[in-house]
UniProtKB/Swiss-Prot annotation:
Any one GO CC term of the record: cytosol
Lineage: Archaea, Methanobacteriati, Methanobacteriota, Thermococci, Thermococcales
Any one GO BP annotation for this protein: 'de novo' IMP biosynthetic process
Keywords for this protein: ATP-binding, Ligase, Magnesium, Metal-binding, Nucleotide-binding, Purine biosynthesis
Catalytic activity reported: N(1)-(5-phospho-beta-D-ribosyl)glycinamide + formate + ATP = N(2)-formyl-N(1)-(5-phospho-beta-D-ribosyl)glycinamide + ADP + phosphate + H(+)
Name of the protein: Formate-dependent phosphoribosylglycinamide formyltransferase
Subunit record text: Homodimer.
Protein family (similarity comment): Belongs to the PurK/PurT family.
Gene Ontology molecular function: any one: phosphoribosylglycinamide formyltransferase 2 activity
Catalytic class of the enzyme: ligase
Binding site for N(1)-(5-phospho-beta-D-ribosyl)glycinamide: 26-27, 86, 295, 375, 382-383
Residues bound to Mg(2+): 276, 288
Length: 429
């Protein structure tokens, strides 16, 4: 790890700076594209061939990232300057071993270890960062789950202790939902479900993500820069639409920066963190943290200047390149270019070789564009693309993104065409 960098080499030569992506989805693809623009060599790893980031990397490897020996074989061969986890399903022991051997793990192995485990994260938020969260309890048996839900109160949320994207989570309205919540955690979690966290339901106005980025300043000191908070909503626990700026009060915005600063200072390291929070009026509660670019932050592909999306900011922090900002009331802020919004394009069916139509109409809409991720396989709920829209009025950007997304139809080799307008919950149009 260096401090502020003044030089870069050339990819595929002996002067190259090299990054290794552990996970090669749509977020990794955008990191790889930003790296390519700076002549940085990119190596992408995932469990399946032709994952999105692999399509724009210099080299790729397919294997089980829970297998420590596989990860070591790649690292020893490539000797990257930075190892960038993009997903949760990675052997954590390997990350600590890489650091011990002198490799730079982004942001650091400990932050990744904490963030992917809800109990470790919640205890870190409450006891070390000392930031407000919803009330919570843990359960390891069905009887304990009944007891915890009664004490927290209904409605409440149950979540597998290790998972992501809403998998293994359930909104519990009353005791009759608890058996289903237990089954959901035990069968749908993307990681361990040996324990379940029960969280108080916060009746929030908006859910936001703060994309706080820790990086070196011109004096070689680590500072934190804050883009405008990103508003978003989820459907069935998974991101469906986002927009920037979030429509919150000035007081709440300052509290968002304060909470994000306390959390990222505790986690440490370099890079961008997606800090999820609930906002109601002027009150803010911390929820979860992603130690990497965040799904909802794809809106910055439209709202931020070229090269400074959340992916560009993450890469600059990793490489030790400068990030502009302005100090306002004690916080270093990154300026937006224009209000913008996203809306997902999701599969409703399973199958291979997805095809999309409706593009002639969708791509004719002014102030909007589409990103198709290039995933070779579809299944219900899988995110295959996103619409970006921008406008001086963020409400208009939100409507435009939604409208364009619903123009797209999708099919696979084994299914018929289906439109995106099958989902209407929380929509504006």
């Amino acid at each position: 790890m260096i401090k502020l960098r003044d030089e870069l080499g050339t990819a595929t030569t002996d002067s190259a700076q090299k990054i290794l992506l552990l996970g090669s989805g749509e977020l990794g693809k955008e990191i790889a594209i930003e790296a390519q623009r700076l002549g940085v060599e990119v190596v992408a790893v995932d469990r399946y061939a032709n994952a999105p980031a692999m399509q724009v990397a210099h080299r790729s490897y397919v294997g089980n990232m829970m297998d420590k020996d596989f990860l070591w074989s790649v690292v020893e061969r490539e000797k990257p300057d930075a190892i960038i986890p993009e997903i949760e399903a990675i052997n954590l022991d390997a990350l600590f071993e890489f650091e011990k051997e002198g490799y730079f793990v982004v942001p650091n192995a400990k932050a990744t270890w904490i963030a992917m485990h809800r109990e470790r994260l919640r205890e870190t938020l409450v006891k070390e960062a000392k930031v407000p969260t919803s009330r919570y309890m843990y359960a390891t048996t069905l009887d304990e789950l009944y007891e915890a839900c009664e004490k927290i109160g209904y409605p409440c949320h149950t979540k597998a202790i290790m998972s992501s994207s809403g998998k293994g989570s359930y909104f519990v309205r009353g005791p009759e939902d608890i058996p289903k919540a237990w089954e959901e955690a035990k069968t749908k979690a993307r990681g361990s479900a040996e324990k379940i966290i029960v969280e108080e339901h916060i009746d929030f106005d908006v859910e936001i993500t703060e994309l706080a980025v820790r990086h070196f300043d011109e004096n070689g000191e680590i500072v934190t820069t804050f883009p405008k908070p990103v508003g978003h909503y989820q459907i069935d626990g998974d991101y469906h639409a986002s927009w920037q700026p979030a429509e919150i009060s000035e007081k709440a915005e300052r509290e968002v920066y304060r909470i994000a600063k306390r959390i990222t200072d505790v986690l440490g390291g370099l890079g961008l963190f997606g800090v999820e929070m609930f906002v109601k009026g002027d009150k803010v509660w911390a929820n979860e943290v992603s130690p990497r670019p965040h799904d909802t932050g794809m809106v910055t592909l439209a709202s931020h200047p070229p090269g400074f999306s959340e992916f560009g900011l993450h890469l600059r922090a990793v490489l030790g390149l400068p990030i502009p900002g302005e100090w306002v009331d004690g916080y270093r802020l990154f300026p937006m270019l224009i209000p913008a919004a996203t809306h997902v394009i999701k599969a409703k069916v399973s199958g291979y070789s997805p095809r999309f139509r409706g593009l002639a109409k969708a791509l004719s809409v002014p102030n909007a564009t589409i990103r198709l991720f290039g995933k070779p396989e579809a299944y219900p709920g899988r995110r295959l693309g996103v619409v970006l829209a921008w406008d001086k009025d963020v409400q208009e950007a939100k409507k435009r993104a939604e409208m364009v997304a619903h123009m797209i139809e999708l099919r696979t080799r084994s299914s018929d065409w289906h439109s995106q307008d099958y989902e209407k919950r929380k929509h504006l149009l």
